[in-house]
Amino acid sequence: MKKKIVCAMMCVAMVATSLVGCGSKADDTATDNAGTETTDDAAGDDAAAADDAAANAGSGKVYYLNFKPEQAEAWQDLAASYTDQTGVEVVVETAASGTYEDTLKSEMAKSEAPTLFQVNGHVGLANWKDYCYDLSGTALYDQVKSDDFVLKDGDAVQGIAYVIETYGIIYNVKLMQEYCAMDGAVVASADEINSFDTLKAVADDIQAKKDELGVLGAFTSAGMDSSSDWRFKTHLANLPIYYEYKDKGIGSTDAIEGTYLDNYKQIWDLYITDSTCDKALLSSKTGEDAAAEFACGDAVFYQNGTWAYGDITADGLTDDDLGMLPIYIGAPGEENQGLCTGSENYWCVNKNASEEDIQSTLAFLEWVVTSDEGRDCLANTMGFTTPFKAFDEDVKYKAQNPLISAADGYVAAGKTSVAWCFTSMPSETWKNGVGSALTEYAQGTGDWDAVKTAFVDGWATEYAAANGQ
């Protein structure tokens, strides 16, 4: 009973709170460094850094429309600190999950439009390239390690990735160890899971032994409300797209064939069958529900990514509790597959803003990726792996968490990372169509043929609409 009460309190806290702000992380860093410099030295360094930031900040203002709700508090704290140091107003607004494109359209129509926004890749850039300032020649572009992390239109640099992320099936190490110690366990270690067939056998067995293991299900709820459905209509849907592209040697298409949709079906069936909740409840289940279920030990597996680290460790889970598996769908050769790694987060500066606001926005971005405070916040508070040179100058600015380590481990083992092909999805309307069909299939009000139709026919329709065909 005590365990259940504590767990309930943790889950409530998780839903009610977000990530720890940058101020707390800065305080920890100051404490850690206390043995190497005096308080006066630290204060002097901070004052000098503030003076430098103020000198370069410009006379405009910054309005950042943030894409990531899970980092909203951290961005607010970082913006407030920059304003304190420079006097430059930095406003951070965060779009609700799943609404970024609509929110951006609305905000761009206002007289006080965002000076800093983001696109998800080349498809997103196509909609907004007329708003994008050329970032070539800026201090931000000088910090990028490779043009692999930028979006170009001709020679113009119109977007710069600010985080490289990885997703897969996060698992609770301790629960897996407890399962593996049970009589008749399918595997002796999570390391033996290297295919869909093995994953399904393990998940089915955990589901059958859930009471003995003390969980509600093998997988967290596959919630299909707007705070969670992107995990399945976008991130999970990436797998059949990736394998089709891989077979054809392409990076985009005007007409997806759906070669691997049967594989998509079997992983989706596994998620919604070996679950913490009844399929009929999925339409109302949220991202917070899934995170809380995992953090409280109600499920062994949780599809999400490195960005979820702060949420699931905020209330009890430790680094030792976390591992990550590839998302196996039964594709040929998947035993050599790694995790899904890429970016859909590219900063763009609004070229229609005033020159003063543009320069202040560029100065803010330079400070974010080069200052001690900015780097600490991105790497350690937000948990980002970034493509910027300044983060390589000190190991403390390299994000260290077991989910990132898992990704590095698969690469070191020679596994092939799964590319983020979902950035080629033709539109948000296409994603929503697939999401609706998945939901109806899960709750028994639709069939899988409707998913295929939304996936294949919907792709052709939306691609043609997006490209004026």
Q: Which residue ranges define each predicted feature?
A:
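Extracytoplasmic/periplasmic solute-binding protein
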Residues: 156-162, 167, 197-253, 299
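Glycine-centered hinge/linker elements that transmit conformational signals in sensory
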Residues: 203-204, 248-284
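Short, polar/charged alpha-helical segment
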Residues: 54, 69-89, 434
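Extracytoplasmic/periplasmic substrate-recognition and gating elements
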Residues: 110, 315-383
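Short, solvent-exposed loop/beta-turn-alpha elements that line the ligand-binding surface or hinge
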Residues: 136-149, 191-192, 223, 241-266, ...
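Extracytoplasmic "Venus flytrap"/periplasmic binding protein-like
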Residues: 81-146, 158-159, 174-186, 293, ...
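C-terminal capping/gating helix-and-loop segments adjacent to ligand/active sites or protein-protein/ligand interfaces
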Residues: 405-461
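Hinge/lid segment of periplasmic solute-binding proteins
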Residues: 50, 55-56, 120-177, 231, ...
